[in-house]
From Swiss-Prot:
Protein name, UniProt field: Metallothionein
Family membership noted in the UniProt record: Belongs to the metallothionein superfamily. Type 4 family.
Provenance organism: Lytechinus pictus (Painted sea urchin)
Keywords: Metal-binding, Metal-thiolate cluster
TM helices/strands, residue ranges: none
One of the record's GO molecular function terms: metal ion binding
């Protein structure tokens, strides 16, 4: 699995958004400039999130720890 510096997944509106490098959830945005393709349910390398996870609000995790 690629490290977060290569590819990270950020939760937003129940979607999963792949970002090429850089920080994702820290800034409260799904993706940095560039790739904005969203697919699948909300999840990322750090945690498994419940439905309704958004970076702008609280992120309820069912496993692990979100930085959102």
């Amino acid at each position: 699995m690629p490290g977060p510096d290569v590819k990270c997944f950020c939760c937003r509106d129940g979607k999963e958004c792949a970002c090429g490098g850089g920080e994702c959830c820290i800034t409260g945005k799904c993706c940095k400039e560039g790739d904005r393709t969203c697919c699948g349910k909300c999840s990322n390398a750090a945690c498994k999130c419940a439905d309704g996870c958004k970076c702008e609000g609280a992120c309820a995790c069912t496993m692990g720890n979100c930085t959102c």
